[in-house]
């Protein structure tokens, strides 16, 4: 499967070559299982389309479509630069990249936002970005569960959004 081709339409919306090339390289590193699983392995937290096979891809594309719409608004463009907007564009693709853990568990692992952040920080690619940019994108991924930070099945408490960008990535 050509992973990059799946996201070609999203990549075409990037405004900077630097972050587009980085995102393209990172897409190649996403575990294969992400391209076949439903977005909700328990069938509870996503719509019917996203709970079907390949639903995770639908989830990413829907998230990205809304993200791109909002990033194109005059108000948002006045408050952000091209690079910031492109980092935000990475989030729909990266936020669930390790959704079922590093080994592809049958179910979503509660810690997956933290695993996604770790994956962003630690993965080296040909068109890599600086550590501050990686940390920014990682934090967007880590806080994407919003106020739903805990579960009885895990001792891990996920971080809540701390700023407007993180809040935006949670509720889009």
Labelled PLM ranges:
Residues 60-66, 110-126:
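An active-site-proximal "capping" alpha-helix that borders the catalytic cofactor pocket
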Residues 56-59, 95, 110-113, 144-145:
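Histidine-centered active-site/metal-ligand motif
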Residues 1-104:
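Acidic/His-rich, divalent-metal-binding segments that scaffold phosphate/diphosphate chemistry
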Residues 78-79, 88, 128-172:
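Histidine/acidic-rich helix-loop-helix segments that form or flank divalent-metal centers
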Residues 103-108, 157:
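Metal-dependent catalytic cores of enzymes that make or break cyclic nucleotides
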Residues 56, 83-86, 90, 109-113, ...:
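Short capping loops/turns at secondary-structure boundaries
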């Amino acid at each position: 499967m050509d992973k990059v081709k799946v996201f070609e339409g999203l990549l075409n919306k990037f405004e900077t070559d630097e972050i587009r090339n980085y995102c393209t390289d990172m897409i190649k590193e996403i575990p294969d299982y992400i391209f076949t699983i439903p977005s909700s392995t328990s069938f509870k937290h996503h719509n019917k389309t996203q709970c079907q096979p390949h639903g995770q891809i639908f989830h990413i594309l829907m998230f990205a479509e809304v993200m791109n719409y909002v990033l194109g608004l005059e108000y948002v463009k006045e408050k952000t630069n091209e690079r910031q907007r492109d980092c935000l564009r990475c989030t729909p693709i990266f936020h669930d990249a390790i959704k079922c853990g590093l080994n592809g568990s049958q179910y979503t692992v509660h810690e997956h936002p933290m695993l996604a952040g770790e994956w962003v920080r630690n993965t080296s690619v040909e068109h890599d970005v600086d550590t501050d940019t990686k940390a920014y994108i990682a934090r967007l991924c880590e806080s994407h569960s919003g106020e739903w930070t805990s579960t009885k099945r895990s001792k891990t408490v996920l971080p809540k959004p701390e700023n407007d960008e993180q809040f935006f990535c949670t509720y889009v």
